[in-house]
């Protein structure tokens, strides 16, 4: 669907095109969205087989590869009732090896797998408004080792049950816009199987609850539909200190873009983005953006909690920059350059600012290119 000028002044129309999905579809992508630990440059492939058995089911295969990691996902879903109930099952596997020795001379190696069941049901389905509810159960397993000695650094399982609501709404306010939102609550259990790190997990209770939320608004600013403003927020709250696999992160191409992937991890946090976009000739879109986020590392602090970052328990990151996107006939290429706003709150024992990837890059650039077929 897309927004376009209405028949009368001040009106916005929503164009919805209903088409039968192709039997097979896919996407290939190259980007630098990965972690420096396992290789920033990534290759991505996504393949979908639609209506596999003739009942509206879908089989999906996704993969991501970098210099030091390989990730794969297999998912299947099918309609379970005439009124929109859909059931699904998915599994993932990832292995990694630390290809950069900035964090530790011994590096790290490990793997992880997940398995999950899902159910989704539409509460509201209309041209202007949609509201869906979801129920998911996931099992996650992680193993991390010292690459030199093969000693287990950490091994643990997580069981999660989550309930969620998500939706969108199209309206004609101020020239037309699209609003989206989602909320979810997760009830989880952490089972630490083994570790060689002293005190690992001592301040991370096994049972936890967390609440996650997100929302966005894409608002037209001009009558010609060429200029828009985009606002997005997201975050999470938690009952106790969380394991790193369940934490909230601020940095990266989908967060505060002036900072690297996995920067600013915490049990609780919030993130906001403001972006002004202008469509240009030849299918280009220019944007200017501002990102800001706050993270609380621990719900409950303990002796020695600061570790190597020497930051306050609660701190903020900010950044601003420019982006350019080109879309044409299945091709999608975009890039962004972001500068830090304010000082970096993370520093080492010598008082030097440092990021989680061992660099102090400023500005920081992100680029991705994909083709959909």
Give the positions of each predicted feature.
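Outer-membrane beta-barrel initiation region
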Residues: 1-88, 125
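Residues that define the transmembrane beta-barrel architecture of outer-membrane proteins
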Residues: 10, 39-43, 68-72, 111-115, ...
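Transmembrane beta-barrel strands of outer-membrane/channel proteins
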Residues: 3, 28-32, 45, 61-65, ...
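Repeated loop/turn-to-beta-strand initiation elements of outer-membrane beta-barrel proteins
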Residues: 24-26, 53-59, 82-88, 96-98, ...
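C-terminal outer-membrane beta-barrel translocator/porin domains of Gram-negative envelope proteins
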Residues: 143-307
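Outer-membrane beta-barrel translocator/channel fold
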Residues: 91-115, 121-122, 140, 144-148, ...
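Outer-membrane beta-barrel "beta-signal"
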Residues: 47, 324-332, 337, 357-373
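Membrane-embedded beta-strands of outer-membrane beta-barrel proteins
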Residues: 14, 45, 74-76, 117, ...
